[in-house]
Amino acid sequence: MQKTTYYESSTLFGGYSYGSTNGFGYEGPQQPFQPGSHVENDFQRSACSLQSLGNTTQHAKSKDLNGSCMRPSLPQEHHPPPTVSPPPNPTTNSTSSNSIPSGSAKVPRVKPTSVQTPSLTKQIFPWMKESRQNSKQKSSSPSTETCSGEKTPPGSSASKRARTAYTSAQLVELEKEFHFNRYLCRPRRVEMANLLNLSERQIKIWFQNRRMKYKKDQKSKGMGSSSGGPSPTGSPPQPMQSSAGFMNALHTMSSNYDAPSPPSLNKPHQNAYAHVTNYQNPIKGALQQKYTNTAPEYDPHVLQGNGVAYGTPSMQGSPVYVGGNYVDSLPTSGPSLYGLNHLPHHQAANMDYSGPPQMPPSQHHGPCEPHPTYTDLWPAQPTHLLGGQNPGGPKLTHL
């Protein structure tokens, strides 16, 4: 309505010329050039007259756009002047000024005293220009414009984006997808958008909101379990589960390496079990010699037994000498480790209680053959248990 009233007033003014200094030459096309006195007399006859000429220039703008003053002046000329009722001046002023809409009160900013006939039809004021907000409001809700031409303020609810209402089928699919994957890649998001008839933006926003909801739920569960113990209905939060699983894994790893010590000292046959358990330390030492090629740890025990050397250092460092290395370390290191110093060394012949019968000294083979001094010193040593037949490790058949 604002634009229509403005252009109607411009067409009314466009066909007429301002004949007087007051600018009120709008009585009709038959009398375009009228003297000022005649215009004032005709203007006093109208229903919208004013008292003083000083007020006429001020209120002429509003009466031009008012509906009661925009009818043509031809019927006024045909009617006799006494038929027009004399207007009450103050009331008509107030009603004419109050009936003007607030939006259209700003329309004629051009002063009527200055003659601007060509510029009236082309001038566009700032409030008439189309803005981005106005175009959005027109496209979304065309009924927001009121009858007086005033538009709703931009911060009202009509300018906000409408809330997306998801159907139950869409929510089921979205929840199912969120259960398997909390973050969607773009190809999967495009596929979900085509499947559910939604836009990618809607799916992305739904997943963002769902992640925030999940985070809030986990936080509330964590606070509830820390204050009042774990809830009976729900599982503990995911960080607590992962830490518990990690601790369990560490516990199983440590329990694998905590091998129980053999009950050798509690058995009646202390000598046999003491020597068998003593094999473990030389095995570790021999493996270290095998892989690191360093000097053997048990050099003072291995190299000399009762003042007799059992081999060169090169042979002792080699893997072939491993079997002999175990046996050589027995007489000096074994009894002293377990506090069996009171036992003489010649009792080693009676040590094997559960193994097969002993082999004669002539049948020693493997690394024990090239050492005749070894068999002479220890004729009754159970070499089949000490790694004589298997240089890689001892056969502990009685355990």
From Swiss-Prot:
Compositional bias ranges of the Pro residues kind: 81-90
Lineage: superkingdom: Eukaryota
DNA-binding region of this protein: 159-218
GO molecular function per UniProt: DNA-binding transcription factor activity, RNA polymerase II-specific; RNA polymerase II cis-regulatory region sequence-specific DNA binding
Entry keyword set: Developmental protein, DNA-binding, Homeobox, Nucleus, Transcription, Transcription regulation
Amino acid composition bias (Low complexity), ranges on this chain: 91-104, 221-232
Stretches the record annotates as Disordered: 18-164, 214-244, 352-399
Pfam families assigned to the protein according to its UniProt record, in alphabetical order: DUF4074, Homeodomain
Family that this chain belongs to: Belongs to the Antp homeobox family.
Protein name as it appears in the record: Homeobox protein Hox-B3
